Amino acid sequence: MARLNPLSFTPGPVIFFTCAVYIALFAALLTVHLRVPDYPSKTPDGVNLTQAWSDLEKITRRFHPYNSHANDDVRDYLLTRVKSIIASKKLGGDQVELIDDNESNATFSSGSTTVYFEGTNIIVAIRGSEDDEPYHSPQSSPPGERRLDNGGVLVNAHYDSVSSGYGATDDGVGVVTVLQLLSYFTESKNWPKRTVILLLNNGEEDFLNGAKAFMRHPISQIAHTFVNLEGAGAGGRATMFRSTDTEVTRYYKASSHPFASVVSGDGFKKRLIRSETDYKVFYEELGLRGLDIAFMEPRARYHTVEDSTRETSLNSVWHMLSAAIATTSGLASDTSEQFSGSEDEHEPYTGKVKTGHGTDAVWFDLFGKVFVVFQLHTMFALCVTLLVVAPLFLIGLTFGLSKADKNYLFARKAYMYSSDDDHPVHLYGWRGFFRFPIVFSIATAVVVGLAYLMVRLNPLILYSSPYAVWSMMLSAWFSVAWFFSRGASAMRPSALQRMYALIWLFAGSFALLAFVTVLSNNYQVAGGYFALFYFAGIFLALVLSYLELFFAPTKTAFARYSAQGDEPVSRPLTGTTTAARSEEPPIADDDATETTSLLRGDRRSFARHSGRRDSIDDENGNRDEEPVQLDLKQPYPGEQDWSGKLPGWLWLLQLLLVAPIVVILVGQIALLLTSALHQTPADGNSSLFVYLAFALLTTLLLAPIGPFIHRFTWHVPTFVFLVCVATVIYNLVAFPFSREHRLKVYFVQQVDLATGNNRVSLTGVDGYVQRIVADLPSAQGEQINCTTPEAANRKELMTCTWPGLPAQVVTRASRFSNKTDTDGWLDFSITTSNKTNEATISVAGQNTRACRIVVDSHHSGVTNVTVAGAVSDPRFKAVGETGSREIRLWHREWSHPWNVSVTWPRENSKPSGRIICLWSDANAGDIPAFDEVQHYLPVWAIPSKISDGLVEGFKYFQV
């Protein structure tokens, strides 16, 4: 009895190894993605995780947005901690300086909005051990004009939270990381070579205001590189969101647990990700080179009360802290000039530090252990090389096979001597060529159809059950692909089916790589890096298939061998010939005729070859030839007999070439996009885009199974099909939200201060927000008006408004005002000059430090804005090119007035509009409507702020 080959291309080994590869890699990827590495028992000198956690608990006790009294308390605590750390270290004096910045202000514009902001940043400068010159000389030169040098490193985190969240992850972990960096770098053994600037900025949540104020301080010109610490979730791993260039990114490589993909960087670069961080200011406006390290999931807890210490962990703190230490230490140890600009590019007052030019980068991690980074130009060169070399190499192999008479691809017939033979041997080389594209198209169409079905019937199920959606799509693609591939193989078996599938995969990945190459060269998009490895693996696997054919007999030898009667000349179109032949009764000895085979009991004979043999004998003079001896093993049932000569184990090498690298790289991208996108439809993003992304990635993940799937027996596909049915049913009928994955609804209360009328609004997903509002006590019996929001990025949502509980943001703060009615919350006056197009608007809000002046939409806006006390800066334009229709005012003092001078075009009418003041402090129960929403929301929903203020009190004005 022949021994079973455990590596042969038969169902058992194929099922075992294919399932083992995919299951093992999927499990490993999910473990790395979902589990945060444990913090070490021993930390580096200067790092105290217990103290870091204590700091995090203290600064996140209450909501602390810029416009809240709790924000002042957090600032006082941070100042105390910074002073305590500096005092406890040996490094001090001229080496470390604390800057309590209560002076910097900035006036700038974005679009049709002007912002005046007064900063309250905390800055600590640690002079580098190799920096001999003073690093801080405020009086020496204005910002934007200072000496060129090799620069230092800026590390930034913001200590303000949003008005609806405690800010543990956004950005409390970043803040305590900065405190630990201060403790670490002020250890004498850790003294950095380059100056390190530690910035705790205030006001990031409202318009990146704190970073803008930092630009006004002279010390902003010291650093040439930066590390920005952020948070957009609650716990988990901190990923490197984006980076400016290859040279900076290489220093992240020292992180003990890297977690990053350039795909997220491309998302920011191409504006697919709407939110912004201080990275934008440091890179685009200050000219620094650096990177963003941030938490990114779960987004359902972002900017809510669940962004708390309860939802994060010390492991998450260590993950960010360890990455920050490694990256900052590396950058601060770089004494080269790669981050320095040249003299000839220095232009006074450009506002940008001269940091040289970096190269676009490609980066990704492998299982959170290895970090790969190289230049985008290198990727482009490799792509072009593969696109040229791979086809030429395959053409060469094809030519070699043809010369060796072993090219069975597309071969219909073979002849013993020449095409003049009467009866050629049929090789069926075309059989199976069109199977893979048909199977691939049908399976892909099914998952795309499921995507549209989900969008139609239950689009938000991916909000709480993204992995159920993944299971549905993966199982659907696999089961459909198996059904058609196995069916085709059963009807028309072909030994070339695997090779033809690889040829089609080669063609498809060639087109994909060509597309990625164009994107990388013309648009600097690096997220297609996986296509390079995808194509390379398929190319090598296909090369093995070509080499495998060199083990086959020559077509001529096989034809002669078949003609001898030892093997059948050809097989019918079905794969049942062998079985059918075995069921026919053998010809008895007594029935032997002149055409009976010499092998008794075998119906195969020379009769069908007699005519051909006669012609051959006539042509060749009845020459005698030695019988052709071919050691053909039994082929897989139903497949071409010549394939019995092929090695049966090469398929495993092919599987290992195409599957693991695809699963690892595409799987990591799939998990990253899942975390980043699956809860964005609740913010107004398109759910169809997310489902189609899942469908595309499903196809990319499972396509490498295509060459092998026809060997699977029915057992595994049946189980997978049952999983598909179960997940389809679940995804169609399950409620999309849960206590763990709450739907965010966005709150704001608007008060007409002249009349006292107030309207509370909740914005959320259509169909769900109405249910939420209807159950609120204050909305019962009231007329609820639901309309589409005006904001372009929330057109997919619905805003429901009703008369809410009156706000008490001023009456309880009696120390700020003796007035108890809403009219006293905001005072303003307008003074006009002799000129017909100028006016000064004085605004004073009670118990607030944030107000706005909004010009009506029918007016073109103002062309000049000057705020009393503002310092001009040539780097900032107070008004954009199209004018300003909104002026946002922020003051570091409470209830402090603003005097704003505005100018408008002479040909326009005098502006009119609204003056609005904001109240954002929800800690003391001064906003009963918000407290009511928090209290009465169903367990599957949670409130968040929709704008800078929870309460907007307004009065109308006319110049």
Curated annotation (Swiss-Prot):
Q: Which domain of life is it from?
A: Eukaryota
Q: How does it sit in the membrane?
A: Multi-pass membrane protein
Name of this chain's protein = Vacuolar membrane protease
The lineage, from the top, is: Eukaryota, Fungi, Dikarya, Ascomycota, Pezizomycotina
Catalytic residues? E204 (proton acceptor)
Cytoplasmic topological segments: 1-13, 400-432, 485-498, 546-645, 710-716
CDD domains reported for this sequence: M28_Fxna_like
Q: Identify the glycosylated residues.
A: N48, N102, N105, N685, N785, N818, N834, N864, N899
Instruction: List locations, semicolon-separated.
Output: Vacuole membrane
Vacuolar compartment ranges equal: 35-378, 454-463, 520-524, 667-688, 738-959
Q: Which PANTHER family match?
A: METALLOPEPTIDASE M28 FAMILY MEMBER, VACUOLAR MEMBRANE PROTEASE
